[in-house]
Design a protein with these regions (language model features):
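Conserved micro-motifs of the catalytic ATP-binding
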Residues: 9-12
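Short alpha-helical Gxxx[C/S/T] motif in the catalytic ATP-binding
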Residues: 90, 94
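Conserved glycine-rich
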Residues: 102-103
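Acidic ATP/Mg2+-coordinating residue in the GHKL
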Residues: 56
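Short beta-strand/loop element within the Bergerat-fold HATPase_c
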Residues: 38-48
Length: 130
């Protein structure tokens, strides 16, 4: 189920979640190498959680790098060989923020095709008064 113009409430610090989304989208833009770059954002209902997917059609992440992209100071081959490379702490901060909120983050990617970053946050559910 993809949400369309529907309010979704999660248990989270809004500023921290904005930081997560900003970091992921900034990385997608930073490593975009196509003249017509595309970034898609989807929000899905997955039981007690909301899943956010941020997909790009950028350079992608190689299979040997993918398991480590959320490790502190890890830089992929693409970022090490790029003048745009960062410090390697951005995605580790994303992971920490999401874990502190009871969520998690992961990614799938194919070199030359792009990357999908996924993260989940627990939905807010009102407890009925007795």
């Amino acid at each position: 189920d993809v949400y369309k113009r529907q309010d979704v409430m999660v248990i989270a610090d809004g500023e921290q979640i904005r930081r997560v989304i900003h970091n992921i989208i900034s990385n997608a833009i930073k490593y975009m190498d196509k003249p017509k770059g595309i970034i898609q954002i989807r929000i899905k209902d997955v039981g007690d959680f909301i899943q956010i997917e941020i997909e790009d059609n950028g350079k992608g992440i190689g299979p040997k790098d993918l398991p480590y992209i959320f490790d502190r100071f890890y830089r992929t081959d693409v970022s090490r060989n790029s003048s745009k490379g960062g410090s390697g702490i951005g995605l580790s901060i994303v992971k920490k923020i999401l874990e502190d909120h009871g969520g998690k983050v992961w990614a799938t990617s194919r070199l030359g095709i792009g990357t999908i970053m996924y993260f989940v946050l627990r939905k807010y559910q009102e407890v009925p008064m007795k």
